[in-house]
């Protein structure tokens, strides 16, 4: 049986693709980077999800 596990990079790229549809790709990248700098323990995918949500609200 094949499982559908997508990599961290694929998840981040999906988030950035969605952000790009709002012309917010770079803003999400920058904000995610700031979140990870502020909290080095933060999961990379979670940082991108949080940044995306911050920009599209």
Labelled PLM ranges:
Residues 1-57:
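C-terminal alpha-helical interaction appendages
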């Amino acid at each position: 049986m094949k499982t559908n596990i997508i990599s961290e990079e694929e998840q981040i790229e999906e988030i950035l693709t969605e952000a790009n549809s709002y012309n917010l790709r770079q803003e999400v990248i920058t904000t995610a980077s700031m979140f990870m700098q502020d909290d080095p323990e933060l999961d990379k995918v979670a940082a991108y999800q949080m940044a995306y949500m911050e920009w599209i609200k």
